[in-house]
Regions:
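Glycosyltransferase catalytic domains, chiefly GT-A lineage
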Residues: 1-230
């Protein structure tokens, strides 16, 4: 069983961001293999990724096309705006009992987060955040991922999580919902959690994307990130 991390990017700015994210994986999980699917391989320095796979027909959600192509038996997909700050081996152990794992979407009261595709789904089954996805290679998951790619193309939503929610709801994959420390979406959470509540494992902040105009927020973020660097 080979476990590994996959990044998928379209566009050179996001590819550069993925390089920074991958370095954080290397620092905290040196034994993990890391692959990149991208359309800007020339922007990638040597020594960061184990393998680079070129995307021939990139688009803003190339992720959904490439997830089924992972060579790993157990895959952790990460967005490019992520920093890994702890050992992740226990995540892969989840796949001994479950097929697919993700955290709930955080902004669950937004209209786009509650968007309906084809079927009404209970509010108590919210969207899953697509930036941290853990899955095992099996027929059920491969079918789910291929259906997700097709549905994103057909449905016309700007966000890919709308169709994922319904597909998972209708699927018989064994789903595990990751606790929030495995997908910390906002720096403010780090200010209110005490040491007995949770220890962040994966930081998933928009401010880690250089492609975003977020310079005004990066100084306080650096201070928070420094908590994990010793």
């Amino acid at each position: 069983m080979i476990s590994g991390v996959v990044f998928i990017t379209a566009g050179e700015p996001y590819t550069r961001d993925a390089c920074a994210a991958a370095r954080s994986v290397r620092d905290s999980n040196p034994a993990l293999q890391i692959d990149l699917f991208c359309d800007a391989a020339a922007a990638v320095p040597d020594g960061i990724f184990d393998r680079i796979h070129v995307i021939d027909t990139p688009h803003r959600r190339s992720k959904v096309d490439c997830l089924p192509l992972s060579r790993f038996d157990r895959t952790l997909y990460l967005d490019s705006d992520i920093r890994v700050v702890a050992d992740l081996s226990s995540m892969f152990a989840l796949l001994e009992r479950f097929d697919f794992a993700a955290a709930h979407a955080h902004a669950r009261n937004r209209s786009q987060t509650n968007a309906r595709w084809r079927h009404d789904i209970p509010d108590a089954f919210p969207q899953l955040n697509g930036g941290v996805l853990l899955y095992r290679k099996c027929d059920k998951v491969q079918e789910l991922l291929r259906d997700w790619a097709q549905s994103f193309s057909d449905a016309g939503f700007a966000k890919d999580q709308v169709t994922l929610r319904e597909l998972v709801w209708l699927s018989d994959v064994r789903l595990f919902v990751l606790p929030p420390e495995y997908n910390v979406r906002y720096p403010k959470y780090l200010k209110v959690w005490d040491e007995d509540e949770a220890k962040a494992k994966i930081l998933h902040f928009k401010t880690f994307n250089s492609a975003e105009d977020t310079n005004r927020r990066k100084r306080p973020l650096k201070s928070l990130f420094g908590l994990f660097k010793g």
